[in-house]
Structure formats: C-alpha cells, structure tokens
C-alpha cells in the first residue's frame, strides 16, 4: 500500500492528455435510465438512505410568490440599478420586480434586513468529481495533482464515488453562495460513471453545466480506456438528459488538451449536438505550444468556447480568443499555487476580454468564491503597482471591486451560456439570488456594499440562497439536507476510494 504522495510524477498536462493519440474515428431532467439508477442505488444504501431525502426546513411554499423585503440590493444591471433598500419579487421562479416598497399581499416574505441581496456567484470550471478528495493536496504542484488525483485515484473511481464527489461539491457550492457551476467532468471511465455524475447534479438542486469529458487511467492514456465512450456518448447524453437547453442542468463538452488531431474530433462531437465547449489552454510550459493558432488554422475557434487558465498564451492567441468571441475562465488561486503561470487578469483586460472566475480543484484550494474574488483583485493591483514602481508611465487602471463582482456573476453567466437567464437581478431572469448578512463581525458596520462582498465577506455571511426561485439555503442552513447521512456518505465514499486505490489515508 502506498502513501498519498508516493505516486510517480507525470509529464501529462492537467487534463491528462499531453500524448497525442491517433485521430478519433426537458425540463424532466431526472429521467435517468434503469442502469444509472442501479448504479447509484448502492450510494443511498450504504449511507443509510439518500443524503437529500428529508422534509425541508426553511423551504417556502411551492408555487407561491416570494417577496425579498428590505435588503440592500445590488442588481448588477445598469438599467435596474442598485438600491440602499429595496425589494425583489419572485413569481414562477423568475424575478418580476426590483424596486422599493413592492406590495404583494399573497407573497411569502423573506426579511432581508441587514442583508445584501445580489445575484448568485457563477463558477465556470470545477472538477466536481473530486469533492470527496478535498484538501488531499494542499502542498501539491500540477505534477503532483496529475499523479495523485488523476492517475492514482481517478483511475479507481467507481460510479458511486463519482456520485458522492459531485454531490458534495454541488452542495458545497450552494452553501457558499454559488448558484450556477460548470462541472468540468473528466471522470468518464464508463457510461455508468457519466450517469452517476448527471444524477448527482440533478439531485443536488444546483443550476449546473455538465461538461462531459474524458476518462482517467493509471498511465494517463485516456483514449485507450476500454470502458469509456468519450466523446461520442455525448449524443446519448443529449437525447437522454439534455433534450432542452431550458432546464436547470445543461450540456457542454470538456475538450482535452493535446494535439489538434486529438482535440478536433471532440469539438466536432460537441457541435454535432449543439453543445458548447470548454478547454484548458496555456497551462505552464506545456501551454507554450501555439495551440490556438493551430486550431484556428482548422477554423475550429468559435464563440461557443470557453478557454480556461490561459496563463502562457501568446499575444496572437489572445487576439484569436477576442476576435472569435470566446470567453475566458481564470482560476487565480490554483494558478498561483500549482505552477500554471501568473493568472492572466490584466492580459485578458488588455485584450478586450472580461474574464469569469472558477475554483478548479477542491483538492488544493477552498471552494468559496469570496477567496477567488480577493485573489484576482489583489493580484491585478499588485501587477499595476509593480509596473508603477518599475517606472511605467502608462500603467493599466486598477480593477474596481464592482468589476470583480461582475466577473464573479454576469461574466460567469456569459461563459456558461446563460447570461440571458441569470447573472443580474433583472426582471424576467430566473431568480438565482443570494442574501449576505452584514450584521457579522467580519463586516459590520457596513459602509460599502460592493466592497464588503469582495474584500470582507466569506461563506459564513451567506444566509439565503435561491436557485430558479427555490430556496436552497435559509437562515444559514442548507434546506432539506440530512447532515448525518451526508457525513456517512462522504466517509464511506472516501474510505472505499482509498482502499480501491491502495493508498493509506494519513490524515495528519
């Protein structure tokens, strides 16, 4: 049995795909197949029942209008504006009005006194299957992550482990105020693994983008995984789970890094079923290969693609992203910690691109978005100050806290293809809303609402979370979650995974 950090280092990229393989030749969302139900049943059985089956406490009455009353409202919509004190009316899961003194006698009232009311955070890139491996690599580099998380653990994941990881990650996101999350899911060792991930997202109640990716293998050669159906199984997923884009969980394709010969067939598979694309690029020295120039030569770059990290892209590649209408996701905490390169915040801005933000891996970084905002806010300011100290007479402007908050909300919605539905508190949009307490010692007395959110708050300030008008968290507690069962689910999944991977779990 090996210790956790005994795994051999690897030269693969973060997606486990540096080698070039041969070219690859509705609203009723929870309509899972009998096979997927059988696959997942063991999870509920071993946990003493499903972790989410409990009479909700703090939930509102289904179908009844909700009036969020008397909060400091940050709509982040220029037409709507912000209000020192105002109300938000929700009808049919959508925002119907944002203004002071709304009268709605039949609505259920949520008192927002001493709270900031704002759009929920939007995460554009998180490997949610790793939710049962939190904190496993606090000191790890990118190479350590590949060797330990992907090769050692990922290759041994069962469908039950995938379910547990995704479910934990989704609940953690909701708890910290993230109302929409892109699951960059590269754990599809079999179709049963895929069904498990989809079911977990649906069961969690999160608004999610399921980005279907490759398998994990002990040698990193995912394209040789015998049980995997990637990327062609995306056609089944579209038909079985994602026949409509107007549902709580929607479909993307997570394209692997590597050569154009590897990537192009996955792009084609996505576009054949009308799915958007997300891909890691510009990661460390491995990212200095001019990949986007090569893909552009094949006319593969379009506005349907989100580019993650982008730390070591060249100027031409940045121009290609801008000119083709692509979006960018920056995971500043991970990028500085694991050796991806400097987070390209200023580079994106200089290129005319407003980035979105993402957590990336909970194996090494915290899952809350407040940390992500503060990381990029401080790094951009540090870069500007460094230029000034070096004698730059025309340095960039400092980011404002409002811009950072927009990166965490509407720009995330844009990258996830959902900016028409979420990201601001505009009447007609879905009611993805969070209420943040200002009567806590880390922020009171509150003097600047946007500044408080970006520079002072944390998950402990998240009082209430609504997704599509449904209350998911209230009074600081998740609604309808049995935590005793949840603890058992996590412990059993973790212990099973360590055993299957032949790794000794050393917790100190």
Residue ranges and their predicted role:
Residues 132-162, 217-231, 285-304, 324-327, ...:
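Active-site gating loops and adjacent loop-to-helix segments of metal-dependent hydrolytic enzymes
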Residues 1-25:
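N-terminal secretory signal peptides
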Residues 33, 43, 50, 55-67, ...:
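Histidine-rich, glycine-flanked metal-binding segment
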Residues 54, 192-318:
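Metal-coordinating catalytic core of metallo-dependent amide/deamination hydrolases
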Residues 299-300, 345-440, 455-457:
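His/Asp/Glu-enriched, well-ordered alpha-helical/loop segment
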Residues 134-206, 230-246, 491-496, 502:
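Alpha-helical scaffold segments that flank or form the walls of functional sites
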Residues 430-487:
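C-terminal cap of metal-dependent C-N hydrolases
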């Amino acid at each position: 049995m090996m210790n956790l950090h005994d795994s051999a280092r690897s030269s693969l990229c973060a997606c486990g795909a540096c080698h070039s393989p041969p070219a690859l030749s509705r609203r009723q969302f929870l309509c899972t197949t009998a096979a997927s139900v059988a696959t997942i049943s063991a999870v509920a059985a071993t946990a003493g029942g499903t972790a989410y089956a409990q009479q909700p406490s703090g939930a509102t009455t289904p179908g009844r209008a909700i009036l969020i009353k008397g909060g400091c409202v940050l709509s982040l919509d220029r037409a709507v504006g912000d209000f020192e004190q105002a109300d938000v009316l929700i009808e049919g899961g959508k925002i119907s009005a944002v203004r002071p003194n709304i009268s709605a006698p039949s609505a259920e009232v949520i008192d927002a006194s001493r709270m900031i009311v704002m759009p929920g955070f939007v995460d554009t890139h998180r490997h949610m299957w790793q939710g049962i491996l939190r904190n496993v690599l606090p000191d790890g580099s990118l190479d350590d992550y590949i060797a330990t998380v992907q090769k050692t653990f990922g290759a041994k994941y069962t469908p039950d482990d995938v379910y547990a990881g995704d479910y934990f990650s989704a609940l953690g996101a909701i708890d910290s105020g993230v109302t929409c999350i892109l699951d960059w899911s590269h754990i599809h060792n079999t179709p049963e693994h895929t069904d498990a991930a989809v079911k977990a997202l649906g069961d969690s109640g999160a608004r999610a983008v399921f980005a279907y990716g490759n398998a994990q293998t002990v040698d990193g050669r995912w394209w040789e995984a015998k049980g995997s159906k990637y990327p062609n199984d995306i056609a089944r997923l579209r038909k079985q789970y994602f026949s409509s884009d107007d549902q709580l969980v929607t479909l993307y394709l997570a394209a692997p890094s590597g050569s154009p010969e590897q990537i192009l067939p996955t792009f084609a598979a996505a576009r054949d079923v009308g799915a958007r694309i997300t891909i890691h690029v510009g990661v460390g020295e491995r990212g200095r290969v001019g990949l986007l120039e090569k893909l552009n030569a094949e006319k593969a770059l379009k506005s349907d693609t989100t580019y993650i990290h982008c730390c070591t892209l060249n100027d031409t590649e940045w121009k290609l992203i801008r000119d083709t209408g692509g979006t960018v996701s920056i995971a500043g905490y991970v990028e500085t910690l694991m050796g991806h390169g400097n987070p390209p915040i200023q580079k994106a801005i200089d290129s005319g691109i407003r980035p979105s933000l993402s957590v990336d891996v909970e194996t090494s970084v915290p899952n809350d978005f407040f940390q992500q905002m503060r990381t990029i806010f401080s790094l951009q300011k540090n870069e500007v100050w460094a230029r000034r100290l070096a004698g730059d007479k025309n340095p960039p402007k400092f980011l404002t806290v409002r811009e950072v908050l927009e990166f965490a909300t509407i720009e995330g919605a844009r990258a996830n293809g959902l900016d028409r539905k979420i990201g601001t508190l505009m009447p007609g949009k879905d009611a993805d809303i969070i209420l943040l307490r200002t009567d806590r010692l880390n922020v009171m007395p509150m003097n600047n609402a946007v500044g408080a959110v970006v520079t002072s708050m944390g998950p402990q300030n998240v009082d209430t979370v609504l997704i599509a008008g449904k209350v998911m968290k209230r009074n600081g507690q998740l609604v309808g979650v049995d935590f005793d069962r949840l603890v058992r689910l996590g412990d059993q999944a973790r212990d099973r995974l360590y055993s299957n991977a032949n790794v000794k779990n050393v917790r100190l």
